[in-house]
Regions:
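N-terminal membrane-targeting segments
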Residues: 1-92
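Catalytic cores of processing enzymes, dominated by hydrolases/peptidases
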Residues: 237, 245-264, 269-347
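Sec/Tat-exported extracytoplasmic proteins
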Residues: 172, 208, 212, 216, ...
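Non-catalytic propeptide/linker segments at domain boundaries
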Residues: 78-173, 177-187
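Active-site-adjacent mobile loop/cap segments within catalytic or ligand-binding domains
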Residues: 323-384
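Second-shell loop/turn segments in exported
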Residues: 189-201, 208, 230-239, 291-299, ...
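Long, well-ordered alpha-helical scaffolding segments within enzyme catalytic domains
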Residues: 203-206, 299-319, 356-380
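Catalytic-core regions of hydrolytic enzymes
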Residues: 198-274
């Protein structure tokens, strides 16, 4: 069978790429260059096995190699990878040029997996835990405003018997995270701190727990006052994930539980223009998902977050700010998500959101989550994994 005269062009770019890589390896060995492991891992992750297979298949069978198809191995792609490996600089990401030169810039190195409406490098979430002594400075709750908001946000719950099988664990690592409208004389984001369950994220956990129970889902809701616990242990607020990790482990070891899903509820420090979305005439507190990359279950957790984001956006367009992936250089990196392949950290709202907006978003999340939960449970039973 006569081979096409044009066949060499399909291999030329691949051969050039190999030559460049060999030259790069030789240069690294000769000059004893040090490559950032994070950059190397990200570069390798950009190569997908299915793309490699398709590339080699198309090279042998031109029927699978239409002219409009982009080549996987091109001089451009190879040169970009070479530059990234040799210098730890990604030409398309300005943060990598100054990441090692400007103190604190690495805190904004969060990877955007799915960008929700308005999400870009300028609106990335970042972590900042206040000192324990600041957390202990209790602020007064705006009692009258809280009662009024709770009255407007009241929801008739159907009284049902809690399911015996507990499969969902809800907790709040930063339980002190509160909201300015619920506190007296609170003006700036750093003021949004409270240990009163009515005014902090524990209240959101209670709402979510009750919603899920009414959907027939068994829930264990931890209401630990993390400020008090950290203070009693003589630990700084930066150790909050270690403390909540112990709570998670205790819950898992309880033989009365059959925990699969783990939801850590947080509140973002961004202001209202970023954390609020009007949907069908009502304001919702926007939410987003954070996935820790420093453990071997992160890909499965990432799939869960992406699926929930997609479902939320389908029903409530604009409610999700997206899905973010973090390593230890940008935060904790694990967030206790190594306990399960169905673990998630959900940031609900920001410092300026009130209970009406927050409760609407909690209700929206639990509606979507419960549908996903039951569909996943049915799929397990069909496949014999239940």
């Amino acid at each position: 069978m006569k081979r096409s005269a044009n066949q060499p062009k399909y291999f030329s770019s691949f051969i050039v790429a190999l030559i460049i890589m060999y030259l790069l390896i030789g240069t690294i060995i000769f000059m004893n260059l040090k490559i950032d492991s994070v950059v190397l891992q990200k570069s390798i992750n950009n190569l997908y096995s299915k793309d490699l297979f398709a590339h080699f298949l198309r090279a042998e069978n031109h029927y699978f190699y239409p002219k409009e198809t982009d080549e996987l191995f091109t001089i451009s792609n190879a040169s970009k990878m070479a530059i990234q490996l040799a210098t730890s600089v990604k030409p398309s990401d300005a943060r990598t040029f100054l990441g090692n030169e400007l103190p604190g810039l690495r805190l904004y190195d969060t990877e955007i997996i799915i960008a929700g409406e308005g999400t870009d490098l300028t609106t990335l979430p970042y972590e900042s835990s206040p000192p324990t002594e600041v957390l202990l400075e209790e602020r007064k709750v705006a009692e009258e405003k809280l009662k009024q908001i709770e009255g407007n946000s009241s929801k008739e719950f159907t009284q049902v018997s809690p399911p015996q099988k507990k499969t969902v664990y809800i907790y709040q690592t930063h339980s002190w995270e509160s909201f300015l409208p619920l506190l007296e004389d609170a003006q700036v984001p750093n003021d949004a701190i409270s240990n009163d369950e009515r005014a902090n994220v524990i209240g959101l956990g209670k709402r979510m727990s009750q919603n899920l129970i009414n959907k027939g889902i068994g829930v264990v809701h931890d209401t630990t006052n993390m400020t008090k616990t950290l203070n009693e242990k003589g630990m700084r607020s930066t150790k909050a994930y270690a403390v909540s990790g112990n709570l998670v482990e205790d819950a898992v070891s309880n033989k009365g539980n059959d925990l699969t899903y783990f939801i850590d509820i947080h509140r973002d420090s961004a202001r209202k223009h970023l954390t609020t979305k009007n949907i069908n005439g009502k304001d919702y507190a926007r939410l987003y998902f954070v996935v820790g990359k420093e453990h071997n279950k992160y890909l499965e957790n990432l799939d869960t977050a992406k699926e929930l984001h997609k479902r939320l956006e389908a029903k409530y367009p604009g409610i999700s700010r997206g899905v973010f992936l973090k390593t230890k250089s940008e935060g904790n990196g694990v967030y206790n998500q190594d306990v399960s392949n169905k673990a998630m950290l959900v940031e609900i709202g920001g410092v300026d959101n009130d209970l009406n907006e927050l409760y609407r978003s909690v209700d929206a999340f639990t509606e979507v989550f419960s549908e996903y939960y039951w569909e996943s449970s049915e799929a397990k039973e069909v496949n014999g994994n239940g």
